[in-house]
Amino acid sequence: MRPFKYIKIAAIITAAAVFASAFSGCSLINFFNRYNPSNAPTVAPKSSSGSAVALGDRKQTNSGYGYSSLGTDELRSLYDTIGEYMNKSYEEEFTTNASLSDFDFALGAYEADHPEEFWLDLNSRYSYIDYGFSFSFKLNFEFEGEQLSAAKETFEQKLSEITSSAPQEASDYQIEIFANNYLIDNCSYDNDNSMRHNAYGALIDGKAVCDGYSKAFQVICNSLGVECVGINGYCPEFNRENGESSDTGHMWNCVKIDGDWYHIDVTWNDGDAHIQRYLYFNMTTEKIKENHVISPLFADKKESDELFNVFVPECTSDKYNYMKREFVTLYNLDEDSELLAEFLAAVQRGDRYFDFLVSEDLDYQQTTQSISDYYGYKWIEAVNGYNSGGAQIDSETQFYTYQNINAVTFDIKYIN
């Protein structure tokens, strides 16, 4: 699979404002008569993120959707044979009556189910000899013998270390957040690393491209009992804008949370902008298709299709979309008590950022202009008043707008 070239997409920031001019001649800490701390709004409790499971009770899962996609006994037998030879210490040839097409399907299904088996050379996955009545295949490895054993041991130790650092008691949604954040904090996009296309590159080297991120994410989730699959596809519009071929491949994931499937693109979540960490976190199929093209299932692929999928769930729920779940939504500029409560809580925690969504029922540009002209000042005035005995917000505070996702971020500067 050809790598997807990752470019930081901080360009989603479309505007910024400094509130200093609005504060001219005003003290930010003397509004106690108007905003008495005793009247401060409180944050409403969020709905449950799902049933919490103790870390020690979490069991590894392998959903086996690749195997399940194989519709005949012959294909399933070929899948098992591939598994047998994938787990040998050295490359060995084996003979089968299967066609090249069937072999590609079975191998793709096996790879989809086993992202932890990182040693297949993805630049040349297999070689074969055509005998006319049968084929002799050999899977090509990145490592063999003692090197392979050592690499497996290193990988397993690292994976154990990662999963042991997961929250001691957490829902599947919280485990998903952990896996997303682990990769963002410990892996960087790198097109030069020889292991960039697999989970080893992401977890051991800390350097990978999209399929390395995706496979590592699947490995972490599956190891912690969260169903996760890889999705192959393209991002042609993004590729064209960045000088790439429109058919350059991309890979991301789907996860199953509380019975519903969601798309998540950890590679695109890894960037410079603060809010980008959760930009593509638990999206519907309709939403992800705005800039991702999902490759066809094997049965539907054309000869010209380089990539295919063995399983693509339909994702229709936005219950666990990170931004809709974690960010307060502004529905009316003059009915802002819920927003103020969240803003105040962020300041009391000492957070660097405060994020919220603008309702799709509001005109985004008009709303953010009103925030720049007046409401941003009003909210900071209110938070400083409500928090009179604690941290105070400085006039150098800025806000950033992300119109494509209807979000706003306050980059909070505190008075020393």
Identify what each model region corresponds to:
Residues 2-29:
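Sec-dependent N-terminal signal peptides of Gram-positive bacterial secreted proteins and lipoproteins
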Residues 18, 25-170, 292-416:
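N-terminal accessory/pre-domain segments preceding catalytic cores
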Residues 92-96, 186, 190-194, 205, ...:
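Repeated polar recognition positions within modular binding domains
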Residues 99, 199-213:
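A short, highly charged nucleic-acid-interacting micro-segment common to nuclease
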Residues 147-202:
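Secondary-structure boundary elements
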Residues 212-287:
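Hydrophobic/aromatic-rich core segments of domains that either
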